[in-house]
Amino acid sequence: MSAKIIDGKTIAQQVRNEVAALVQKRLAAGKRAPGLAVVLVGENPASQIYVASKRKACEEVGFVSRSYDLPMTTTEAELLALIDSLNNDSEIDGILVQLPLPAGIDNVKVLEHIHPDKDVDGFHPYNVGRLCQRAPKLRPCTPRGIVTLLERYDIPTYGLNAVVVGASNIVGRPMSLELLLAGCTTTVTHRFTKNLRQHVENADLLVVAVGKPGFIPGEWIKPGAIVIDVGINRLESGKVVGDVEFDVAVERAGWITPVPGGVGPMTVATLIQNTLQACEEYHDINENRVKGQ
């Protein structure tokens, strides 16, 4: 029996439509549109594609989108100065600095320089700490997007044995925190994990984010499991595949995300959600205080 497909494209479009409707309500009430600043340093082709998709999504929902395409020669001090300016800009609710940054610029220093209230990627230590303390504010986009997929498909998670393959700061670690919040018993595996197969075979819910095509053989999947494949890998043939051997896994799993069209669209949709949230929860309040003075 083939698994049911978790269609990230459809759910992402639903999310964007919902945000667009809320933006129209804001405008009708005399409020400003949310604003997102997207900063790209250098000319990494993959980064340019990601940034273009984010800018397009902003325009689709009616956000104010500001683009800052900086040359590869940009210094760390120049980038931090731009972030300072955006932190103090009352029309900007979210600041996104596209990673990776060129050599010589400290990723951590740059991300920590973004004000937590404008950290719509959810990478600032304050926002990660809030998630860890079970009181999340702006949440990392890919993990939150995955949770949204599970919720929209009414897939129950309480009591499941969840396994996350990959322990990156962007996906694996925050994903484990999201799964704990969702009531799962959660295991995180990484490059030092012994007997990975045993962990995967015991997973009721499997999230794989390692960036290696077909890293998890389909035969390892527990029958009926929920499989979330975060990987996006382009083969020499040009075909895009995930981190899980899809053709075999789809015959064993109960639910599975395809690649492409699964998790990827949700990352951008969640960025849009986070920007609206930052606008309404943080900056509307501050603007009202200023008007009341």
From Swiss-Prot:
Gene3D superfamilies: Leucine Dehydrogenase, chain A, domain 1, NAD(P)-binding Rossmann-like Domain. Its EC number is 1.5.1.5, 3.5.4.9. NADP(+) binds at G166, A167, S168, I232. Transmembrane segments: none annotated. GO terms for biological process: L-histidine biosynthetic process; methionine biosynthetic process; purine nucleotide biosynthetic process; tetrahydrofolate interconversion. The keyword Hydrolase applies. It catalyses: (6R)-5,10-methylene-5,6,7,8-tetrahydrofolate + NADP(+) = (6R)-5,10-methenyltetrahydrofolate + NADPH; (6R)-5,10-methenyltetrahydrofolate + H2O = (6R)-10-formyltetrahydrofolate + H(+). GO terms for molecular function: methenyltetrahydrofolate cyclohydrolase activity; methylenetetrahydrofolate dehydrogenase (NADP+) activity. It comes from the Bacteria. It holds the Pfam family THF_DHG_CYH_C. Keywords: Amino-acid biosynthesis, Histidine biosynthesis, Hydrolase, Methionine biosynthesis, Multifunctional enzyme, NADP, One-carbon metabolism, Oxidoreductase, Purine biosynthesis. One of its GO terms (cellular component) is cytosol. InterPro entries: Aminoacid_DH-like_N_sf (IPR046346), NAD(P)-bd_dom_sf (IPR036291), THF_DH/CycHdrlase (IPR000672), THF_DH/CycHdrlase_cat_dom (IPR020630), THF_DH/CycHdrlase_CS (IPR020867), THF_DH/CycHdrlase_NAD-bd_dom (IPR020631). Pathway: One-carbon metabolism; tetrahydrofolate interconversion. The keyword Oxidoreductase applies. PROSITE patterns: THF_DHG_CYH_1, THF_DHG_CYH_2. Belongs to the tetrahydrofolate dehydrogenase/cyclohydrolase family. Homodimer. Catalyzes the oxidation of 5,10-methylenetetrahydrofolate to 5,10-methenyltetrahydrofolate and then the hydrolysis of 5,10-methenyltetrahydrofolate to 10-formyltetrahydrofolate. This is Bifunctional protein FolD.
